[in-house]
Amino acid sequence: MSETETRPTNFIRQIIDEDLKSGKHSSVHTRFPPEPNGYLHIGHAKSICLNFGIAQDYQGQCNLRFDDTNPEKEDIEYVESIKNDVNWLGFQWSGDIQYSSNYFDKLYGYAVELIEKGLAYVDELTPEQMREYRGSLKEPGKNSPYRDRSVEENLALFEQMRDGKFKEGTICLRAKIDMASSFIVLRDPVIYRVRFATHHQTGDKWCIYPMYDFTHCISDALEGITHSICTLEFQDNRRLYDWVLENITIDCQPRQYEFSRLNLEYTVMSKRKLNQLVTEKLVNGWDDPRMPTVSGLRRRGFTSASIREFCKRIGVTKQENMIEFSSLESCIRDDLNESAPRAMAVLEPVKLVIENYEEGKVETLNIANHPNKPEMGTREVPFTREVYIEQDDFREEANKKYKRLVLGKEVRLRGAYVIQANRIEKDEAGNITTIFCSYDEDTLGKNPADGRKVKGVIHWVSADKALPAEIRLYDRLFTVPNPGAADDFAATINPESLVVKNGFVEPSLATAEAEVGYQFERTGYFCADNKDSSADALVFNRTVGLRDTWAG
């Protein structure tokens, strides 16, 4: 962090400041604990920036821990993807990567301790019976008929569970807390269940697995986490978090703090809905540039700096709110406006022939890579007798507000000459196929000698030297701000969320690196696709337009 940059403030940082000042903690230790059962999205990025950012700013530590207690839904592919996303966002975890599965032996021991204290019991209610016994927000729960088993019987049964003597769904270990609690999470929650599943870290060593609420708090304590930060849906779970730690023999007593999760307009972040988009092929995979996944945003051309800035701007509160999608777009637009070199691309070409320009001549023009940053240098752009311009940049007739090329009028080609449109050719359907022009040879890099004013400037590429490219125009995936609230969210998908154009780009883009942003002049910000683009077949993704077309 630079000296001029101010450290963000929020209620969590205020708590940390007080804890350090009072001597409650001498240092700060946070963690980011994803379950490896899917790809990270921008909501996770908010949590990553918060937890790793706090560790950075307070010269503390932040662990990356995989909460891997559900082997049927987890995969090493997700582990690797999450590691890559955290690194790409600009963060590095402290020490080795942690896994909750590293603590399975200790977790088993703590479960035995609860049984020995009379605070856990083996239950044989069916899942349906357990739901019935649990009660509701208005009705207290009922005690299981197995609740008062002896410590000895519970220990023996739990050992048999571990040894694989029971079928899945027939038996579990529950904490003995209070079936009449006003908090349903405290109504004797399940803390271990039988699962005959191969685990990606521990193989077939275990056939019983601890539940998240039991595992999470103990993992935090074993790692010396000082501030366990999670989203608001875990607010009630804090009571169970504290209960577990207060009733086992463990040194560290972390505290859990909750903040509001990210809700972003025009997208969904529910894992179930995102999975539906992929499995029903409504998008092209988890890294589709329309997806809110970190890999999708990265492929679209969002920079890690822009996502960090977005997370900084939206802040950290306990208040649930919906963030405008334009806020995210503003961050990447601000970033690329400063950093992206300029280039020219024509998405809907029409040929323009300069009749008084020498046939076969190729002129090399040096054009600035950035209008305000001479240190970014120049690039060579070939100029020839025939060029392509955008169809929208020409009209046969137009009013004075139209500042582009009009029949009989002049315009400047960006970085090149002033030209005048003299005549056109059309096909049988009436579409313009060719615009015939003349150029003023004495206007390269300067105004016409006779002082006439030429106000319009349009971009172009050489028809002979330009490279064909597939241009993917990405837009918001949904047509409504809150698609998750719709009865059928898939019905609100924006049919214009991907429009493909076959255009031409200037030759300098032949070596464009994937994910590196360019401003296609007068069009938007683009990057080469990180999967489909190659030297033989260029593919560019639109990251964001030059301005917010959804405003107002």
From Swiss-Prot:
Motif 'KMSKS' region: list the residue ranges: 268-272
Q: Which UniProt keywords apply?
A: Aminoacyl-tRNA synthetase, ATP-binding, Cytoplasm, Ligase, Nucleotide-binding, Protein biosynthesis
Say which species the protein is native to: Aliivibrio fischeri (strain ATCC 700601 / ES114) (Vibrio fischeri)
According to its UniProt entry, the protein's GO biological process terms are: glutaminyl-tRNA aminoacylation; glutamyl-tRNA aminoacylation
Would you tell me the protein name for this molecule?
Answer: Glutamine--tRNA ligase
Keyword Cytoplasm among UniProt keywords: yes
GO MF terms here are: ATP binding; glutamine-tRNA ligase activity
EC numbers listed for it are 6.1.1.18
> Which family does the entry's similarity section mention?
Belongs to the class-I aminoacyl-tRNA synthetase family.
| UniProt cross-references to Gene3D superfamilies, sorted A to Z | Glutamyl-trna Synthetase, Domain 2 (1.10.1160.10), Glutamyl-tRNA Synthetase, Domain 3 (3.90.800.10), HUPs (3.40.50.620), Ribosomal Protein L25, Chain P (2.40.240.10)
